[in-house]
């Protein structure tokens, strides 16, 4: 076996290793994607919106009690899966699973650019693949996985100095969820200060994303049946009125929810979000539990909290560009939520900055490997840590994919009462 492996070139061994990881990522995201076979959590809103897009090109104002409070892009993405695979649980979630898998490839490419190391690139991609929150969001037809992907893609494009493309992608992020505006503002301000292009930068990261955002509303403009479309004879005035209503909804959302979680406890996994829970009778026990729990892999997230503090320290004392960019995207995706402690928020919103938490961990590993005398031992220690994270991921895996457990096994995974 060793002679067979030694006969394969280093490049081909690397391709096999990464291909295997990508295959693992795809399998964990696509196998049994139709489970649960019903709409879970906010899928009820977004799948319904996707159906409207396919039927009418716009989310319809049909007198229903619901109010549409997010832009169209993410729901168009969900609609693509339904168009390809039918109005079925697999179809609802296909696009999320595809984007989630591509995100792992993207993190690999980003780490390759930042750290110029195959080992560190594989570490970054592996940690993404082994995160429970990313897996759950990749298997659920919500908007946040698309938001996370667009922000991550913009980061990659900035690393490539492709600023126009990054601006367009940030427009797509904004057209998915408004929370992208914090990242857009932070990125634009950073580039304005760095490059001092006081005319071009505002056009790139002000006008361009706005035009992309407005373009995402094309179906609304072309229809007479969209929400608030007929508020005024002037379509733009109607859109502005509608956006005021949306803004009022977001700023006044304080309704209690059993799984709400303030932003301050996201990093410590204080209150994960249960998307689905049932008590089936097919686990060979008197009492069974089936759950889809949006919970980051605990060992990974707690390591991420420590790594974040270390990365901030490195940036403060060394002003390293890579640390600064990681922190720019991470903190602009996270810190604004701390300003709204009364608003109803959920832990799974953290998926927007989760990739940058992973990159923060890899950044700290990269710093640890700079000492050549200790590199071998520290690399082995990093591999042990990844193995422990993998075991932790495997332990919680049934909760991520809606697997059926007997009640005692399910309860054993509730490490804190706040997870129930």
What function would you assign to each model-found segment?
Residues 2-7, 200-201, 205, 209-213, ...:
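Transmembrane helical bundles and short interhelical boundary loops of multi-pass, membrane-embedded
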Residues 20-21, 107-130, 163-165, 324:
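Transmembrane-helix signature of polytopic, membrane-embedded enzymes
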Residues 22-25, 124-129, 170, 174, ...:
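Short helix- or helix-capping micro-motifs
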Residues 39-40, 96, 133-144:
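Short acidic/glycine- and proline-prone juxtamembrane loop motifs at membrane-interface regions
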Residues 90, 94-115, 153, 310:
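Transmembrane-helix motifs of polytopic, lipid-linked glycan transferases
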Residues 106-109, 127, 146-170, 357-360:
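Specific aromatic-rich, kink-prone transmembrane helix
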Residues 27-32, 44-76, 80-83, 244-247:
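Extracytosolic helix-loop segments that constitute the early lumenal/periplasmic catalytic or substrate-binding loops
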Residues 35-56, 205, 209-269, 405-416:
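Aromatic-rich transmembrane-lumenal/periplasmic boundary elements in polytopic membrane proteins
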């Amino acid at each position: 076996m060793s002679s067979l492996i030694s006969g394969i070139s280093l490049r081909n061994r690397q391709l096999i290793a990464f291909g295997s990881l990508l295959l693992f990522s795809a399998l964990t995201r696509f196998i049994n994607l139709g489970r649960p076979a019903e709409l879970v959590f906010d899928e009820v809103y977004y799948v319904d919106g996707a159906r409207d897009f396919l039927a009418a090109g716009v989310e319809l104002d049909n007198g229903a009690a619901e109010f549409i409070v997010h832009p169209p892009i993410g729901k168009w993405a969900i609609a693509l899966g339904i168009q390809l695979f039918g109005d079925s649980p697999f179809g609802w979630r296909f696009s999320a699973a595809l984007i989630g898998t591509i995100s792992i490839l993207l993190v690999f490419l980003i780490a390759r650019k930042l750290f110029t190391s195959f080992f560190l690139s594989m570490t970054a991609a592996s940690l993404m693949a082994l995160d429970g929150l990313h897996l759950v969001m990749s298997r659920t037809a919500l908007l946040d996985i698309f938001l996370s992907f667009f922000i991550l893609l913009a980061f990659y494009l900035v690393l490539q100095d492709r600023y126009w493309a990054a601006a367009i992608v940030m427009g797509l992020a904004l057209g998915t969820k408004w929370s992208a505006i914090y990242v857009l503002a932070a990125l634009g301000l950073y580039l304005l200060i760095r490059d001092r292009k006081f005319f071009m930068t505002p056009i790139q990261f002000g006008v361009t994303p706005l035009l992309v955002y407005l373009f995402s509303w094309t179906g609304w403009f072309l229809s007479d049946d969209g929400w608030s479309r007929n508020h005024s004879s002037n379509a733009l005035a109607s859109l502005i009125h509608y956006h005021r209503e949306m803004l009022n909804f977001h700023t006044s959302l304080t309704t209690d929810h059993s799984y709400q979680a303030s932003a301050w406890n996201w990093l410590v996994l204080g209150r994960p979000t249960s998307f689905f829970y049932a008590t089936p009778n097919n686990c060979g026990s008197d009492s069974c539990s089936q759950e889809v729990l949006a919970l980051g892999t605990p060992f990974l997230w707690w390591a991420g909290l420590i790594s974040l503090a270390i990365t901030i320290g490195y940036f403060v004392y060394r002003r390293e560009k890579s640390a600064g960019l990681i922190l720019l995207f991470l903190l602009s995706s996270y810190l604004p939520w701390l300003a709204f402690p009364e608003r109803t928020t959920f832990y799974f919103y953290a998926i927007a900055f989760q990739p940058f938490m992973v990159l923060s961990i890899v950044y700290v590993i990269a710093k640890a490997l700079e000492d050549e005398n200790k590199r071998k031992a520290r690399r082995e220690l990093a591999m042990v840590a990844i193995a422990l994270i993998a075991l932790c991921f495997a332990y919680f895996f049934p909760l991520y994919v809606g697997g059926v457990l007997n009640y005692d096994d399910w309860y054993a995974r509730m490490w804190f009462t706040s997870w129930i």
